[in-house]
Amino acid sequence: MRTYQPKPADVQRAWHIIDATDVVLGRLASQAAQLLRGKNKPYFAPHIDTGDFVVIINAGKVAMTGNKREQAKYHRHSGFPGGLRSTSYGELLDTRPHVIVERAIRGMLPHNRLGRAQGSKLKVYAGPTHPHQAQQPVPYEIKQVAQ
């Protein structure tokens, strides 16, 4: 008997919604990356996009352990000499919290065309509202130990 290889037409995509309130950033990112890749499905294949859509709400209330809010830095470069800009995660969490969550999750996806396609199914919102009610997303609970 041959091993089943899923076809792109066979993939059934579900919508998951994750509330990021008081969830540690790394644990949230790893669970979301697994859903985006489709590793929770019995027909997962590493070369086919079998993942689901993931909506993350309350990204501004995500938890960080240790002193990462003050010490961890977000860097971006304009491409010009002297164009490096750094911002602490605390400042970024106050102004643009979706950036921190998106970067953490996309860093756990493959760094190729397939990873970009999987990352496009990620929707992150800083507050509790989102425009995806029509898709009827299923709540996904992240189980974590006490902090």
From Swiss-Prot:
Keywords: Ribonucleoprotein, Ribosomal protein. Residues 126-147 are annotated as: Disordered. This protein is one of the early assembly proteins of the 50S ribosomal subunit, although it is not seen to bind rRNA by itself. It is important during the early stages of 50S assembly. This is Large ribosomal subunit protein uL13. The gene is rplM. It comes from Parafrankia sp. (strain EAN1pec). HAMAP family: Ribosomal_uL13. GO terms for biological process: negative regulation of translation; translation. It comes from the Bacteria. Part of the 50S ribosomal subunit. The keyword Lipid biosynthesis does not apply. InterPro entries: Ribosomal_uL13, Ribosomal_uL13_bac-type, Ribosomal_uL13_CS, Ribosomal_uL13_sf. GO terms for molecular function: mRNA binding; structural constituent of ribosome. The lineage of its organism: Bacteria, Bacillati, Actinomycetota, Actinomycetes, Frankiales. GO terms for cellular component: cytosolic large ribosomal subunit. Belongs to the universal ribosomal protein uL13 family. It holds the Pfam family Ribosomal_L13.
